[in-house]
């Protein structure tokens, strides 16, 4: 992430009781699914801003440090076990990957960052690309930032949140791998993060790309960003395959 991120300051609205409810209520008996996510298809990989699709419609981007479960999150969202490749090699995502949903709707997979073994030249190329994307992309509605709840909020996360918010981009944090902690411990960790001055007003929720915890709430948020005012709920059934992707940790 470009060094200029460090110079940005930001302030987002204070969390509401509804924000807390989103993280608490992960056993909704009537699951919500934003249907276009099930129709996701890979479109292209981008290494230069000029290669991005036309800047129209609406898109949501997903970012995160290497190894936090970003690809597994995309696969869980789309109910496609191999849509985003899950790799045993951190930092595998080396470009912006574009997935088409319904016409005019896109899901954007941003490069994983913060892994020390990624070549320096590659890291330097990511910074300007991410900076241009976040600063100039008018169709970008929100940034979903995936964190490992066991090791959340590092310096790179702080840089990205500050820069995105400084560009006027809503940021929503997924505290992934919440299933690795007890419910009480996960809630305590989220409360600790909410108390951090630099995270005041940053929306966040508990999530698990393995169990689907928090999935309904995330579908509702994405529906609101990509199709405001439209009813896109579809029923789910026990036959839907939400098994985790095979393989190791992902970028």
Placement of each model-derived feature along the sequence:
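Short, positively charged and aromatic/hydrophobic N-terminal segments
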Residues: 9, 16-20
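Positively charged N-terminal leader segments that act as targeting/secretion signals
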Residues: 2, 231-243
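Conserved G1/Walker A P-loop phosphate-binding module
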Residues: 20, 25-115, 242
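Canonical P-loop GTPase G-domain recognition
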Residues: 37-47, 180-233
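Conserved C-terminal guanine-recognition region of P-loop GTPase G domains, centered on the G4
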Residues: 131-202
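Switch II of P-loop NTPase G domains
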Residues: 52, 92-97, 111-141, 149-163
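Conserved nucleotide-binding/hydrolysis micro-motifs of P-loop NTPases
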Residues: 47, 92, 105, 112-114, ...
């Amino acid at each position: 992430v470009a060094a200029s991120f460090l110079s940005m300051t930001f302030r987002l609205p204070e969390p509401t009781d509804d924000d807390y409810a989103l993280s608490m209520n992960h056993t909704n008996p009537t699951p919500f699914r934003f249907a276009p996510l099930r129709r996701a298809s890979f479109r292209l990989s981008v290494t230069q801003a000029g290669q991005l699709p036309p800047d129209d419609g609406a898109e949501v981007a997903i970012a995160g440090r290497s190894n936090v479960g970003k690809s597994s999150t995309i696969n869980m969202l789309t109910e496609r076990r191999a849509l985003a490749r899950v790799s045993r090699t951190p930092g595998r995502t080396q470009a912006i990957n574009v997935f088409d949903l319904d016409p005019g709707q896109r899901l954007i997979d941003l490069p994983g960052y913060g892994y020390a073994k990624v070549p320096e030249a590659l890291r330097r190329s990511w910074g300007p690309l991410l900076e241009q994307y976040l600063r100039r992309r008018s169709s970008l509605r929100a940034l979903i930032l995936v964190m490992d709840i066991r090791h959340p909020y590092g310096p790179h996360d702080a840089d990205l949140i500050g820069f995105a918010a400084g560009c006027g981009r809503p940021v929503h944090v997924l505290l992934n791998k919440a299933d690795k902690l007890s419910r009480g411990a996960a809630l305590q960790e989220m409360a600790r993060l909410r108390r951090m001055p630099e995270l005041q007003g940053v929306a966040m929720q508990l999530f698990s790309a393995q169990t689907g915890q928090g999935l309904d709430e995330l579908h509702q948020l994405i529906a609101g960003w990509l199709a405001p005012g439209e009813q896109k709920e579809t029923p789910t059934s026990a036959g839907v395959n939400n098994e985790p992707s095979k393989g190791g940790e992902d970028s």
